[in-house]
């Protein structure tokens, strides 16, 4: 039984065009308040982005749902997330597929996310401290790659780590950003522009 606040958010997401009920069920199952600081717990189920420290944010539920829906996941999908952040998007993915790989460049955020996921008994996630621009070559290829920060252009390494038929969803741009979906098909990459967005930048390198 979902709470009134959760139900209200789900209805809002449906009104915004989210149609995949499995994605909506995953959002309902993951307690977003566990991924934000106590000061923001009362706003956890509002459809807004919230700060998580280190200059990073937890994306608004609409954007989490939209990007996840665009990945066209099945339980068997091999998924890579670039930018673990709070671990919220990771948890949504973990409810939808058998295993998630996630890369985070800020070690403090990586450890916090791992603790949150463990506390929620989500053990089907592998996290790595590293440069998201480089993906996770040792675990490639992937059926789906999601990037939760915006590079100025699509990283080549991520495109090459897509399997045939795989989908990459990411925001791209600097001052003006657009959500892009890249599909690998027959050795080519088909790129679609979805909508205008605003994300923190995807920074190269890693932080201790």
Curated annotation (Swiss-Prot):
> Which catalytic residues are annotated?
59
Q: Provide this UniProt record's keywords sorted from A to Z.
A: Cytoplasm, Methyltransferase, S-adenosyl-L-methionine, Transferase
Q: Name one GO cellular component term.
A: cytoplasm
Top-level EC class as recorded in UniProt: transferase
> What EC number is given for this enzyme?
2.1.1.77
Presence of keyword Transferase:
yes
Q: Which Pfam families match?
A: PCMT
Where does the source fall among the domains of life? Bacteria
A biological process from GO: protein modification process
Q: Which GO terms describe its molecular function?
A: protein-L-isoaspartate (D-aspartate) O-methyltransferase activity
Keyword flag Ribosomal protein:
no
InterPro entries for this protein: PCMT, SAM-dependent_MTases_sf
Spell out the subcellular localization from the entry. Answer: Cytoplasm
What cystine linkages occur within this chain? Answer: none
Q: Which reaction does it catalyse?
A: [protein]-L-isoaspartate + S-adenosyl-L-methionine = [protein]-L-isoaspartate alpha-methyl ester + S-adenosyl-L-homocysteine
By its UniProt entry, which Gene3D superfamilies does this protein fall under?
Vaccinia Virus protein VP39
Functional description taken from the UniProt entry: Catalyzes the methyl esterification of L-isoaspartyl residues in peptides and proteins that result from spontaneous decomposition of normal L-aspartyl and L-asparaginyl residues. It plays a role in the repair and/or degradation of damaged proteins.
| Entry's family note | Belongs to the methyltransferase superfamily. L-isoaspartyl/D-aspartyl protein methyltransferase family.
Name-wise, this protein is Protein-L-isoaspartate O-methyltransferase
Q: Which organism is it from?
A: Shigella sonnei (strain Ss046)
**Underlying gene:** pcm
């Amino acid at each position: 039984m979902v709470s009134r606040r959760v139900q209200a958010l789900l209805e809002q997401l449906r009104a915004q065009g989210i149609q995949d009920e499995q994605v909506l069920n995953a959002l309902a199952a993951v307690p977003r308040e566990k991924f934000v600081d106590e000061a923001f717990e009362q706003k956890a189920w509002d459809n807004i982005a919230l700060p998580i420290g280190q200059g990073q944010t937890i994306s608004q539920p609409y954007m989490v749902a939209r990007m996840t829906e665009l990945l066209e996941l099945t339980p068997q999908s091999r998924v890579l997330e670039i930018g673990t952040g709070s671990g919220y998007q990771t948890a949504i993915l973990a409810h939808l597929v058998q295993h998630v790989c996630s890369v985070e460049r800020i070690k403090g955020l990586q450890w916090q996310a791992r603790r949150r996921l463990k506390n929620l008994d989500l053990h089907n996630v592998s996290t790595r401290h590293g440069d998201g621009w480089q993906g996770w070559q040792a675990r490639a290829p992937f059926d789906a790659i999601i990037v939760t920060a915006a590079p100025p252009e699509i990283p080549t390494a991520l495109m090459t780590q897509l399997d045939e038929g795989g989908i990459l969803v990411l925001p791209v741009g600097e001052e003006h950003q657009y959500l892009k979906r890249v599909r690998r098909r027959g050795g080519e990459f088909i790129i679609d522009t979805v909508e205008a967005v605003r994300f923190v930048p995807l920074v190269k390198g890693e932080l201790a």
